[in-house]
From Swiss-Prot:
Residues 402-570 form the tr-type G domain. Belongs to the TRAFAC class translation factor GTPase superfamily. Classic translation factor GTPase family. IF-2 subfamily. PROSITE patterns: G_TR_2 (PS51722), IF2 (PS01176). Keywords: Cytoplasm, GTP-binding, Initiation factor, Nucleotide-binding, Protein biosynthesis. This is Translation initiation factor IF-2. Its main location: cytoplasm. Residues 436-440 are annotated as: G2. Pfam families: EF-G_D2, GTP_EFTU, IF-2, IF2_assoc, IF2_N. Residues 458-461 are annotated as: G3. Residues 512-515 are annotated as: G4. One of the essential components for the initiation of protein synthesis. Protects formylmethionyl-tRNA from spontaneous hydrolysis and promotes its binding to the 30S ribosomal subunits. Also involved in the hydrolysis of GTP during the formation of the 70S ribosomal complex. GO terms for molecular function: GTP binding; GTPase activity; translation initiation factor activity.
């Protein structure tokens, strides 16, 4: 039988069984065989270990309490205390020895039968005497050995020579008892030797210590009455001598450990389990549990600890001091020596923190906050390169191959961009758009008659959608600039031309609406020629195509021009591997959740892929193409609508496929936290500027808005347009901007902040509708963006108070000053210009400085009250609440324009 099968039979692990064989001196492996004799030796060894364990019983008990500790600031602090008690119950020596004596008696009887010359009664008498003496000796020795064993358990104390003397004392007493036993009974040495061997064997089996018995001892179960008193006296004398010796040793230990500021715990009596705590004051207390809890043993480290401090891109002074386990005040002092004035909550950059850590003698470990993000992108690049190398080595045509061109249609509003795209796609999108204009960016994939694929991106033409047009330019390969034949070059046309120049993109000019009667194509060519677009028939390199979105004239020529241009560009991309895509538009659907429209740039996007997009992540649950059909995968230049993200990403964000969802979630959370920090930093900067503005005399008014939109792009456009409407006297403050219907939370926020709700192509939930109607909250619904902007402009003009301008209608110079009991100070003036009228606004100017603005209170001419005084006439002017008028001052009289 092998060790492995034997372990299964005895229900033990193979490692434990091999260890047991090693303990008895037999080396085995799990494939070795085992004999019957080796089994018996193993079982005997395991039984002995069990007996050794059963001789002791350990009891542990835990008590929980609360301790009130006063702190430096006067407040008490509660500390939870757990007291653990351990009590050991050992089998008394008399019980074990009785077991030994029983076995020994059996051996004596066998000896007596074999040797007739010894009498059984003599052996019994000797065994009784030996048992009595042995019990007494073992009891005393047990006390000493228990004391020594407990001392050996203490880590920072060793057994000293005093205890060795105590052991010698015990041996002397044992020898005296041995001589008494020899004198009482004189038996043959051979019988005593047999008894001694049996006793020692039993003691070895019980894992007990040697009792130091002499060779001529025998064992018995009964103790004679006349020997009890004498042996008891011997035990008492031994106990007294031991106690006196321990007291002397204890005083020596106290003197030696007086300066250690620690406690000495010693176990004296095994049956009582008392603890003596020796404090630095050399006083002995029994069971001082509170002192044992509060007074701790702590040794000050002699060497300075060098720590590894991990430093991010930014770290506060308090956090850095905690990592180095030093006080913040000490760290601030050290930084002041370096010439840095900081506070405890101030953030430090990575270089400064590294300098401080190295100055303190620790090791600085620099960590980039975006390390995980870089790791994911690096893994994606490695996978992409591996796939490319494999395909190149295999010379497979499925690697890099031609992709469909991405064509962006741009132009001024109402020049027919969407209508032209509808004719190409054989759809009617323009008729379903609100206001007849495009307000969202759209991507469509069109399959031509020759099975070639072209992806079109339709951009809005309104001036408010500047950012949306810029995003469309970043994705495109070819630009089709649509210009109406009856309208010519307009502002948004010029803007598109600027984008084309910045991106150095190939362009095709499509002159639309040539089916109208009033057209002037040559004028349009001349206008575009001034911007550097020279037609091919004029010797240039720009293609001009005349088209009509209504009749379809010239549309095929336009498509042919696009295909020719794409062949010249040789557009290729990887069609396998992890996909990369860019977000074109995103929205929130009540039944489907976040819906994201993406354009795949490289790789292959499949259902079930784990994706990371900005601050959001998720798994692709479903995909639809531009026609609304479900698809399983999408290649380069294919726009798809996917579901499964955790939230709504921003337009223009890159979507990448990753291998690990956990890492994707961590990167998304990191990006979200970083975005929040940037937002808070900008908010704090705005708060500082607002505090400075609040110091001005003129109060700046605010209009609070809550914006709800159907798509992410429309929401961004509305926010940017409202911010552009802010003036020095009126600020557009957007409290909340989100996607989806107006909810109860939006209504409550509008009620508490006195805000207006602007709902763009969205509805109101029933719960929010009740709150809005009950509290008369101002909410406006819009479907066209320029209607929204026009109404906001009217609101601003009605809110701002009309500006009042004044003009000077008369000037008077002060010649004399008079005092009147009724009117106070009266200025005697000569009118030098214009007319001075009563109750008009006036300014008092002294040496070119305006001293006072107020109202003309009284006007007299030769003690007669008059309403006006003309040029060249003297008059007296009384000014309300102002008496500091001097001779030579100029008084200007103002009137509203």
């Amino acid at each position: 039988m092998t060790i492995q099968s034997f372990a299964i039979e005895v229900q033990m692990s193979v490692d434990y069984l091999i260890q047991q064989f090693l303990d008895i001196g037999i080396t085995k492996t799990k494939f070795d065989f085992i004999t019957q004799s080796e089994k018996e030796i193993l079982f005997r060894h395991m039984n002995v270990n069990k007996i050794a364990v059963f001789n002791k019983l350990f009891l542990q008990r835990k008590t929980h309490s609360t301790l009130n500790v006063s702190s430096t600031n006067g407040k008490s602090k509660k500390v939870k205390v757990e007291v653990r008690k351990k009590r050991v119950y050992m089998v008394p020596c008399s019980i074990r020895k009785s077991h030994v004596s029983n076995n020994t008696n059996i051996l004596l009887v066998e000896n007596d039968n074999s040797k007739d010359k010894y009498k059984s009664d003599d052996c019994n008498e000797l065994s009784e005497l030996v048992a009595c003496d042995e019990n007494k000796i073992s009891s005393n020795e047990n006390q000493v050995m228990c004391f020594i064993s407990q001392k050996e358990k203490l880590d920072h104390f060793t057994i000293r020579q005093d205890y060795v003397r105590t052991n010698e004392l015990v041996k002397d007493v044992n020898q005296d008892l041995d001589h008494q036993i020899r004198d009482r009974k004189g038996l043959s040495n051979s019988v005593c030797c047999d008894v001694l061997l049996n006793v020692q064997d039993e003691q070895h089996d019980d894992n007990n210590f040697s009792c130091g018995l002499s060779d001529d001892m025998a064992v018995s179960n009964n103790i004679p009455e006349h020997d009890k008193q004498k042996l008891e006296n011997v035990r008492k004398n031994l106990t007294d001598r031991l106690r006196s010796t321990r007291t002397r040793n204890l005083s020596k230990l106290v003197k030696q450990n007086k300066h250690n500021n620690s406690k000495v715990c010693m176990i004296y009596e095994s049956d009582k389990d008392e603890k003596l705590y020796v404090l630095p004051s050399s006083r002995v207390y029994k069971n001082k549990r509170k002192q044992s809890i509060l007074v701790q043993s702590f040794n000050k480290p002699m060497q300075k600890t060098v720590r590894d401090v991990v430093i991010g891109e930014t770290i506060s002074v308090a956090e850095l001091s905690n990592k180095m386990s030093i006080k913040s005040s000490s760290m601030i002092k050290m930084m002041m020596k370096l010439g840095l004035m900081v506070t405890i909550n101030q953030n430090l950059d990575q270089e400064t923190a590294q300098l401080v850590v190295e100055e303190m003698g620790h090791n600085a470990i620099l960590r980039r906050e975006n390390a995980l993000e870089e790791l994911i992108m690096h893994d994606n690049n490695n996978d992409y390169q591996n796939i490319s190398s494999k395909l190149d080595n295999a010379k497979n045509d499925m690697g890099y191959k031609n992709r469909a061109p991405i064509v962006t249609i741009m132009g001024h509003v109402d020049h027919g961009k969407t209508s032209l795209l509808d004719y190409i796609r054989s759809t009617n999108v323009a008729s379903s758009e609100s206001g007849g204009i495009t307000q969202n960016i759209g991507a469509y994939c069109v399959q031509l008659a020759n099975n070639d694929m072209v992806t079109f991106i339709d951009t809005p033409g309104h001036e408010a959608f500047t950012d949306m047009r810029a995003r469309g330019i970043q994705l495109t390969d070819i630009v089709v600039l649509v210009v109406a034949a009856d309208d010519g070059v307009m502002p948004q046309t010029v803007e598109a031309i600027q984008y084309i120049r910045d991106g150095n993109l190939p362009v095709i000019i499509a002159i639309n609406k040539i089916d109208k009667s009033v057209t002037n194509v040559e004028r349009i060519k001349n206008e575009l020629n001034s911007y550097g677009f020279i037609p091919e028939e004029w010797g240039g390199h720009t293609q001009f195509v005349n088209v009509s979105a209504v009749s379809g004239e010239g549309v095929n020529d336009l498509l042919d021009s696009i295909l020719v241009q794409s062949e010249i560009l040789e557009l290729k991309s990887m069609h396998h591997g992890l996909a990369k895509a860019v977000v074109i538009e995103s929205s929130l659907d009540r039944s489907r959740g976040p819906v994201v429209t993406v354009l795949v740039r490289s790789g292959e996007l499949k259902c079930g892929d784990i994706v990371l997009c900005g601050t959001e992540y998720g798994r692709v649950r479903a995909m639809r193409d531009s026609l609304g059909f479900d698809v399983i995968k999408a290649g380069p230049s294919i726009p798809v609508e996917l579901l499964g993200l955790s939230g709504i990403p921003g337009t223009g964000e890159w979507l990448v496929v990753v291998n690990n969802e956990k890492k994707a979630r961590e990167v998304a959370l990191y990006r979200k936290e970083k975005k929040r920090e940037i937002k808070l930093a900008r908010k704090s900067e705005k708060t500082i500027i607002e505090n400075f503005n609040s110091m001005d005399i003129i109060k700046i008014k605010e209009l609070n808005f809550i914006i709800k939109s159907d798509t992410q792009g429309s929401m961004e456009v509305i926010c940017e347009s409202l911010k552009k409407l802010s003036t020095n006297k009126m600020v557009m403050k957007i409290l909340s901007a989100s996607i989806g219907n107006v909810t109860e939370t939006d209504a409550v926020l509008a009620l508490s902040s006195h805000s207006r709700i602007l709902a763009f192509n969205v509805k109101v939930d029933l719960s929010a509708k009740n709150i809005i109607e009950l509290n008369h909250i101002n909410i406006q619904y819009y479907s066209v963006i320029y209607s929204l902007l026009d109404e906001v402009k009217e609101l601003i003009s009605s809110t701002i108070a009309p500006q009042v301008d004044f003009k000077v209608i008369g000037i008077a110079k002060v010649h004399n000053i008079f005092q009147s009991p009724r009117y106070g100070t009266i200025a005697g003036c000569m009118v030098t210009q214009g007319v001075i009228k009563l109750h008009k606004q006036i300014k008092i100017v002294r040496n070119g400085i305006i001293m006072y603005k107020g109202v003309l209170d009284s006007l007299r001419h030769f003690k007669n009250d008059v309403s006006e005084v003309k040029i060249g006439v003297e008059c007296g002017i009384g000014i309300k609440n102002y008496s500091d008028v001097c001779s030579g001052d100029i008084i200007e009289v103002l009137d509203k324009i």
